[in-house]
């Protein structure tokens, strides 16, 4: 914990510059981040009062390979990015969470009321309530806190703004009440629970895991209760490459129902083959019975199942290529993944926008 005035002084005079470089990598971002953090602390002081606070960060994520495989217990390759949600926070002396996100009204939540409220589906308060409930059910201590948060993770742009928010809430509770002892995998699982059960979006676990664990990670969800997480070495600069985030001005905020159709249709194929998830299906059996499956469930579910089976190979190839320094082969796996994802995407293809 650090006094807000002291934090501002130390940030301003450069005492945390090395820490900012560790977090954001790009040295050209440091001045911006220093101003951003100072502004967040000042907003906290204005809304609440000068206090001893902790400052938490949770990054957005980019899927690298393994599109729509996580909800079928498949494999993914994902990375955190240097756009993040930060929260200035401190305990308060009651059982109330007071949470202000930049540009929004204060959310007030009684931590003794952590039941699912269907009227809150799709709202920020549902995510906070769900994370708190999940942490409590896992035996962790929870309590009231004040927080001010600001985010550079674009909403509805495929960078997992909701996952970053869930993870930062979980990390606040870990830091303020549990000595930062809640591991990143468990925070991710609890965050997914909040989004599935309270927010009512049937997402897989990739988003939360990438945001919580950080870095480039290969995640195997064959047993989603015990996902296998492996850090993957990346030296993009060695090949004069960078991962760039482009704001296309499109969004998927209103596509939850369309999104939900993807796991639903994939499961139809899995069910035909006697399983609950495609990961447990034999791809050879799938192709042997292809005509029967098409007749039973339709063409789009079949195409999405083909995508899943191919995508599992793409992930393996991408990871192996990075581990063995075969960058051209890595790019080839990414292109194959993107091509398949594009062809089997939602009906509503984003139109180019002019600004």
Language model regions located:
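Phosphate-handling active-site elements
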Residues: 137-145, 173-187
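Glycine/serine-rich anion-binding loops at beta->alpha junctions
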Residues: 58-73, 152-169
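C-terminal nucleotide
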Residues: 1-61, 86, 90, 94-121, ...
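Glycine- and acidic-rich phosphate- and metal-coordinating loops
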Residues: 132-154
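DPxDG-like acidic metal-binding loop motif
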Residues: 80-82, 159-179
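Structural signature of FAD isoalloxazine-binding scaffolds in flavoprotein oxidoreductases
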Residues: 75-94, 213
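Alpha/beta catalytic cores of group-transfer enzymes, especially the acyltransferase/condensing modules
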Residues: 179-227, 232, 334-337, 341
């Amino acid at each position: 914990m650090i006094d807000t005035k002291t934090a501002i002084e130390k940030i301003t005079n450069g005492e945390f510059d090395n820490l900012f470089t560790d977090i954001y990598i790009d040295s050209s971002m440091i001045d911006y981040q220093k101003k951003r953090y100072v502004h967040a602390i000042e907003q906290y002081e204005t809304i609440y009062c000068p206090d001893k606070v902790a400052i938490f960060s949770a990054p957005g994520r980019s899927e690298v390979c393994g599109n729509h495989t996580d909800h079928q217990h498949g494999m993914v390759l994902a990375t955190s990015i240097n756009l993040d949600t930060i929260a200035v926070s401190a305990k308060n002396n009651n059982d109330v969470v007071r949470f202000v996100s930049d540009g929004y009204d204060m959310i007030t939540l009684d931590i003794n009321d952590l039941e699912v409220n269907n009227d809150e589906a799709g709202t920020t308060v549902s995510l906070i309530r769900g994370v708190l409930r999940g942490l409590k059910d896992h035996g962790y201590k929870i309590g009231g806190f004040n927080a001010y948060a600001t985010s550079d993770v674009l909403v509805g742009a495929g960078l997992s703004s909701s996952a970053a928010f869930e993870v930062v809430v979980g990390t606040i509770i870990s830091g303020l009440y549990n000595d930062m002892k809640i591991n990143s995998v468990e925070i991710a699982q609890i965050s997914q629970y909040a989004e599935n059960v309270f927010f009512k979006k049937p997402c897989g676990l990739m988003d939360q895991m990438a945001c919580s664990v950080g870095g480039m990670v290969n995640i195997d969800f064959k047993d989603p209760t015990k996902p296998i997480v492996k850090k993957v070495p990346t030296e993009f600069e060695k090949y004069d490459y960078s991962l760039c985030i482009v704001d296309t001005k499109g969004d998927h905020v209103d596509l939850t129902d369309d999104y939900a159709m993807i796991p639903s249709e994939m499961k139809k194929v899995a069910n035909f083959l006697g399983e609950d998830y495609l990961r447990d299906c034999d791809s050879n059996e799938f192709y042997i019975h292809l005509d029967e499956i098409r007749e039973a469930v339709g063409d789009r579910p079949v195409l999405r199942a083909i995508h899943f089976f191919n995508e599992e190979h793409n992930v393996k190839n991408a990871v192996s290529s990075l581990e063995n320094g075969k960058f051209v082969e890595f790019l080839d796996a990414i292109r194959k993944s993107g091509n398949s994802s594009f062809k089997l995407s939602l009906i509503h293809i984003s139109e180019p926008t002019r600004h």
